C-alpha cells in the first residue's frame, strides 16, 4: 500500500479538486506542471500517481495522449473525462514497462508517497516504461522543507534511484516555473532521461 493511502486513508477527491478550483479563481496558475512538461517532449505521456487527473487532463488539452495511473480510487474518481486521457486504477510498481511513453510525469509529491522501500523498483519500472530518449519528470518536497510532519525525500536519494534505473540527469529546478536550482531548495523538479539506445 502506498504511503499516500496509509497516511490519508483515501482523500475525498472532490475536496482536493476544490482547493485547486479556489486557487484558479484567485488567479493562481494551477497548471504549472503541465506547462513545464508539455514543452519538453511529446506526445505520449504517463501521469504516474495522477490523483484527480489535474496534470494529465491539462496535458491532454495541450495535445498529449495521456494514461494516468493512481492507487487512490477516491482521487481517481474525480478525474475528468477528457479526450486523449485515460485513467487507470493501479499501483505504480505494476505499471507495464513496455517502452511506450515519451514522458513520465510524477508531479505533486508522488515519489514521497511511494510505499516504503519501493522507490528503487518503482523508478526502475517507470524508466522501462519510457521510450529511448524519453523523459522522467518528478516534483517533490525535499529534505530542506520545513519539518511539519509531512514526508520528504532527499534529492541525493532520488538521484540514486534514477541512476540505478539507468536514467541520466538532464535538469533540476526549485519549482515548476523553471526556477534555478539551489541546494537549499525545499522543492525539487528533476528531469532525467532514458538513453537513446541500449548501452548508451
Residue ranges and their predicted role:
Residues 120-132:
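A short glycine-rich, Lys/Arg-flanked "PGG" loop and its adjoining helix->strand segment in the class I
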Residues 102-117:
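A short SAM/SAH-binding and catalytic strip from SAM-dependent methyltransferases
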Residues 52-94:
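Class I SAM-dependent methyltransferase SAM/SAH-binding core
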Residues 151-166, 172:
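Short alpha-helix
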Residues 133-141:
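Conserved beta-strand signature within the Rossmann-like core of class I S-adenosyl-L-methionine
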Residues 1-51:
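Conserved class I S-adenosyl-L-methionine
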Residues 93-103:
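A short acidic, Gly/Pro-enriched loop at the edge of an enzyme's catalytic core
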